[in-house]
């Protein structure tokens, strides 16, 4: 699976480099992303989008997201003298590409499809009667990711991006949104 992700990244980067050299119009935006992971709280992070346009109303858009969240619990069980600290971390990343369609000079719609990966780690540390115990369990899964959104150009060189992103990785549903601002050149 790492080879698939690496291959997708190399191909996307190659396309972007070639398109930048021949581009009529490029747009780059960076923004805030937030998603809800099934049976967990919200995770937050960053989303980056690149768009290439020529004279056609149909263009190419790519999206890269990285999000992180954690949950911690500490406490003690007094009769047994146990003190514990647990930490659960979730990291999510996605790489997607797709078409964008310009409806007017200031408004476009886009759809994305690609790959998403989630890594969950559980760390446990406890002490009992002066003895210390630690445990760590980690799992990484990869699956299909999709998205859709709108890009607006309130000014000729400014891009405002609002999008939805979802994935279903190994029966874990991840749904969220992203909002970004960027530059069109």
UniProtKB/Swiss-Prot annotation:
Compartments in which it is found: Cell outer membrane
Its membrane topology: Multi-pass membrane protein
Gene Ontology cellular-component terms listed: cell outer membrane; host outer membrane
Signal found in the keyword field: yes
Keyword Membrane: yes
Pfam entry (one): Ail_Lom
Membrane-traversing stretches: none
Main location: membrane
Cited InterPro entries: Bact_OM_Invasion-Related, Enterovir_OMP, OMP/PagP_b-brl
Keyword terms: Cell outer membrane, Membrane, Signal, Transmembrane, Transmembrane beta strand, Virulence
Record's signal peptide: 1-23
Recorded family membership: Belongs to the outer membrane OOP (TC 1.B.6) superfamily. Ail family.
Free-text function comment from the UniProt entry: Essential for full virulence and survival within macrophages.
Name under which the protein is recorded: Virulence membrane protein PagC
Name of the gene this protein is made from: pagC
